[in-house]
């Protein structure tokens, strides 16, 4: 860790804090921001490896906070697809372009955001997508989560039309990605993404991540459902734009 300057430690504290905020209740846009900042210091896949232990360590607290607000029916549909996506990514990681999947996820995110905001304006009724679509979206979420820790857009594409409360939305997302991150751990090891120095560096930022969780939860409790989902849709929209822009 001696090769890191004080400025780099300060810079890396931001993604650690953003990981906590995303787990505390303000959505996956912050997790992507964490990956982007980390990629300024590490190569992208190494940045993902730096963040994964922080995600795994913070996930149990996030799940515990929202433990009474989990929509189990969606878990049963999305999780098999996510696991399939993670497994396929492990075998195909050296054969497919992460830029291409980022573009696909980006367009999906934009479509989701525009559709969601339109539904809010016209007060569209609750809509449940076919389970096959849920498995497909889960697989895309597993892929994008594996590569850039940004699995929220396809998962949100399935959950948001259900018009869940923000607490139930967060509880469901928290459990889904807690399981997803554990599933990703073994493939990351097999790909040789972890080393002793990187793990020691990551563990340094655990307190900052936990602080972010409580800050995210505090903010989540202070805003209405309307404001929360506006933040989610807006962040997903700009997240999609950014994924496309930097992948072209």
Q: Where do the model's predicted regions map?
A:
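Interfacial helix-loop-helix linkers and transmembrane-helix boundary segments
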Residues: 63-77, 93-103, 123-128, 194-199, ...
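Small-residue-rich hydrophobic segments that form or flank transmembrane alpha-helices
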Residues: 9-77, 137-142, 152-206
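Cytoplasmic-side transmembrane-helix entry/capping segments in multi-pass membrane proteins
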Residues: 72-82, 104-106, 128-138, 168-175, ...
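Hydrophobic/small/kink-forming positions within alpha-helical transmembrane segments
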Residues: 56, 60, 79-87, 117, ...
């Amino acid at each position: 860790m001696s090769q890191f300057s004080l400025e780099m430690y300060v810079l890396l504290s931001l993604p650690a804090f953003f990981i906590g905020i995303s787990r505390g209740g303000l959505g996956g846009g912050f997790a992507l921001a964490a990956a982007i900042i980390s990629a300024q210091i590490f190569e992208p896949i190494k940045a993902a490896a730096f963040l994964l232990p922080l995600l795994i360590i913070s996930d149990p607290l996030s799940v515990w906070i929202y433990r009474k607000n989990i929509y189990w029916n969606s878990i049963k549909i999305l999780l098999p697809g996510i696991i399939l996506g993670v497994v396929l990514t492990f075998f195909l990681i050296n054969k497919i372009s992460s830029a291409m999947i980022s573009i696909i996820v980006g367009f999906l995110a934009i479509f989701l955001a525009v559709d969601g905001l339109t539904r809010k304006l016209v007060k569209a009724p609750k809509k449940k997508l076919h389970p096959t679509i849920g498995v497909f979206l889960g697989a895309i979420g597993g892929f994008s989560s594996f590569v850039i820790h940004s699995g929220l857009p396809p998962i949100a594409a399935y959950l948001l039309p259900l018009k869940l409360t923000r607490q139930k939305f967060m509880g469901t997302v928290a459990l889904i990605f807690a399981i997803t991150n554990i599933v990703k751990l073994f493939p990351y090891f097999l790909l040789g993404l972890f080393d002793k120095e990187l793990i020691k560096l990551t563990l340094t930022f655990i307190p900052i991540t936990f602080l972010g969780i409580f800050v995210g939860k505090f903010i989540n409790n202070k805003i209405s459902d309307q404001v929360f989902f506006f933040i989610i849709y807006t962040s997903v929209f700009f997240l999609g734009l950014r994924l496309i822009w930097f992948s072209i």
